[in-house]
Swiss-Prot record:
Domain called bHLH: residue spans: 289-339
Protein name as it appears in the record: Transcription factor bHLH128
Keywords attached to this entry: DNA-binding, Nucleus, Phosphoprotein, Transcription, Transcription regulation
Organism: Arabidopsis thaliana (Mouse-ear cress)
Modified residues (Phosphoserine): 189
Keyword Transcription regulation belongs to the record: yes
Gene Ontology cellular component terms for the protein in this record: nucleus
Gene Ontology annotations of biological process type: regulation of DNA-templated transcription; regulation of potassium ion import; regulation of stomatal movement; regulation of stomatal opening; response to light stimulus
Length: 362
């Protein structure tokens, strides 16, 4: 994760040459996350502590001032990635002003960025060995990714273990156990304070109990820790515990998708055991279907009309059965009118009749 001893020595030799130059490598951590961490830890300090400028030919002195760390501040490094630093009195006198101005900031930045002090000490060795020549550009390598930092802390060779049920990372062993414990608790205590936005959708399901550490799948820290009792700028990744309503909803879903109980099975058996001649439910047919009530009524009406027209065909002579219903009705009307005219003529003939049959009996 950090520079090895061979790369450190090669870079120091390269920077000590009169025309040697190098490249500054920055880790691509989220800028907003790192800026917020620095602002919270420093407490609103100057923005020079996080002014990551790009590659500039004239920014050698500025980068030197930025990466100058406290000589006595301890940095998190493994046994194989230690960096040799020349702590001579001349080097301390040369960088005395920068150490006095930036000692507190470097300590806090060392807590926020894993190998910051290691990089600053490498830069001091480069300045002491080769001097600050105008033609050489100091090169530093910085890894500030939080994921790599957590991986570095979780390694076994650093004597740090993550076997506590809470998410507070604590050292177990090592030469600087007490100091590292306070540093890590001040840096990595993810508490339940309401400092960030809440996420109510995720429930708390503990996993990974047997892998050396246990944590909640909902957040980094679901248990309450007492590392920030004074309330001084804690970094809180919090998730609220599920409410009673969400628990009820989850239980309802579980009972919905689970197998039915014995009582429900018995009820379904009784419901399905129906008589053969009974209809469990009468479904109304759609419009236009043969079983729809209006369709049935229309069919009955047409059947009734067809029966009457058949009787009319028998009464009306010379009516072809292949004619339409309208023609049949016209012929029937004409036939009825003819019959009425004949009836009127017969009545007139009866009134004008003079025979004896027309006389009334006395």
């Amino acid at each position: 994760m950090y520079q090895s001893s061979s790369s450190t020595s090669s870079s120091s030799q390269r920077s000590s040459l009169p025309g040697g130059g190098g490249l500054i490598r920055y880790g691509s951590a989220p800028g907003s996350f790192l800026n917020s961490v620095v602002d919270e830890v420093i407490g609103g300090g100057s923005s020079n502590a996080r002014d990551f400028t790009g590659y500039q030919p004239s920014s050698d002195n500025f980068i030197g001032n930025f990466f100058t760390g406290a000589a006595d501040s301890s940095s998190l490094r493994s046994d194989s990635t230690t960096c040799g630093v020349n702590n001579s009195s001349d080097g301390q006198k040369q960088l005395g002003n920068n150490n006095n101005n930036n000692s507190n900031k470097d300590i806090f930045l060392d807590r926020s960025y894993g190998g910051f002090n290691e990089i600053s000490q490498q830069h001091k060795s480069n300045d002491i060995g080769g001097g600050n020549s105008s033609g050489s550009y100091s090169l530093a390598r910085q890894r500030s990714s939080p994921a790599d930092f957590f991986t570095y802390l979780a390694s076994d060779k650093n004597n740090f273990s993550l076997n506590q049920p809470t998410s507070d990372y604590s050292p177990q062993g090592g030469s600087n156990g007490g100091r590292g414990h306070s540093r890590l608790k001040s840096q990595l205590s993810f508490t339940n304070h309401d400092s960030l936005a809440r996420i109510n959708e995720v429930n708390e399901t503990p996993v990974h109990d047997g892998s050396g550490h246990s944590f909640s799948a909902a957040s980094f820290g679901a248990a309450t820790t007492d590392s920030w009792d004074d309330g001084s700028g804690s970094i809180g990744f919090t998730v609220t515990r599920p409410s009673k309503r969400s628990k009820d909803m989850d239980s309802g879903l579980f009972s919905q998708y689970s197998l039915p109980s014995d009582t429900s099975m018995n009820y379904m058996d009784n419901f399905m055991q129906l008589p053969e001649d009974s209809v469990p439910c009468k479904i109304r047919a759609k419009r236009g279907c043969a079983t729809h009530p209006r369709s049935i009524a229309e069919r009955e009406r047409r059947t009734r009309i067809s029966g009457k027209l058949k009787k009319l065909q028998d009464l009306v002579p010379n009516m072809d059965k292949q004619t339409s219903y309208s023609d049949m009705l016209d012929l029937a009307v004409q036939h009825i009118k003819g019959l009425q005219h004949q009836l009127q003529n017969l009545k007139k003939d009866q009134e004008n009749c003079t025979c004896g049959c027309s006389e009334k009996p006395s």
